[in-house]
């Protein structure tokens, strides 16, 4: 099939239409603003897949209805998914604005004294508010000279934040969530809500029974040569941890090999179901070769699959990572236990950063007193107020070991286009594969085990659905924490020492859900969460406002909160504004 084109950013230079001197004097300055904006975005941003971001600039400056319509025709033909309107001067507000109701939009009004760019910005935003089409305001803090073509740092920050979030919105639209299986062990996030995906994200849900995965494996609907390559890769790179099962449940070498083979096959087949694979057409499986156009997926696993077949831990861990037997590549988004709401948080994080996402149980709050009682160790540094144990049976991306390095040599998780093969190998070397515990997984499997390096900034997120309200987003910025090995071992063995662990310390504010670490744990809305590298909560907030998903919990500095200008008309408290505005406007793709 022809690859679906990536969304582009549309740049709309608007201008005062009065001829005989006014428009003529502004043409060059206005178009240069558009070109400078496009240059910034193409230099600083990439799509989550790693491709360069493209900007489309209107053929002419826009002074009124006719030129606005011509611009819209061009944008419609080039898959423009978000727009930025720029101007240094007064223009005719409602005559020049972008009226597309679902396309994210921002307006940059140049802060200068010669021409009233700020006046147009205010007039245009008033029109957006009155018409119920919210837009983001960009206005520099300091006055610039008319001939100053630079983009101030505060303007650049807003342009980039808007564009990152807008590209995420546009990239999700029209894609699907592959629900492989049904409800896992009564977990509410795996009660997949089609209306949520359709109305808030512009996505479809493809529901497929797990027997389809069984069929593909049993009928060899996969690339057999690739399977051999995957097995060779695993033989070279997998280190195996101890088998903690009772003797009667331990598998011999032949049985273990069969479990590994099926685990790798599951990864291949889930990937093929998500994105398709032309190799399947070569073996006469044309229908299966197309895939389901899935930008994210979830696998139920427990218990209807895992009671008799290998669990999804190996497949999910490999798919969620930025590398496999084919080398470094874009990570997939696959939610364990088909927790679609955690899958959406993973999808948001990946679209905003291009990085792999760490899926985890929000398992245990350890107070400083409890840790000292159990281990004799007194917490200090980032961990002094207590920590949260983030751990799951193995679906976390191996990037979460943080064996990659930033430009200053610090541990991190990088966008896949920056990861070297050596860094991928280091993540693999830091991971052990432990036989699944029989009591949980009767069909066997392998769980990845690694320990996240400490001192790494992370943002933990989660989407929940509240009856009568709709979706809400939770955000907690913080850091991974490194404990002394003996302390980690004692605490880890109290849970499950064969699973990957991140010790997480959220940043506290002393208020509300961030009064203390216990309050963060107590206010978390579900049993799962996602770790995204960096303190990127502000980007999540902007993205959520575009989708009309209110944020019910965050610890982002107020100065970094960036939402459409119309939110300010919904009260004086910015979080109350968010709830009222999201309720007022309703989901982005209203149904």
Curated annotation (Swiss-Prot):
GO biological process: D-arabinose catabolic process; L-fucose catabolic process
Keywords for this protein: Carbohydrate metabolism, Cytoplasm, Fucose metabolism, Isomerase, Manganese, Metal-binding
Binding-site positions, Mn(2+): 337, 361, 528
EC number: 5.3.1.25
Top-rank lineage group of the source organism: Bacteria
Functional summary from the UniProt entry: Converts the aldose L-fucose into the corresponding ketose L-fuculose.
Similarity comment: Belongs to the L-fucose isomerase family.
Quaternary data: Homohexamer.
Protein name: L-fucose isomerase
Lineage: Bacteria, Pseudomonadati, Pseudomonadota, Gammaproteobacteria, Enterobacterales
Gene name for this UniProt entry: fucI
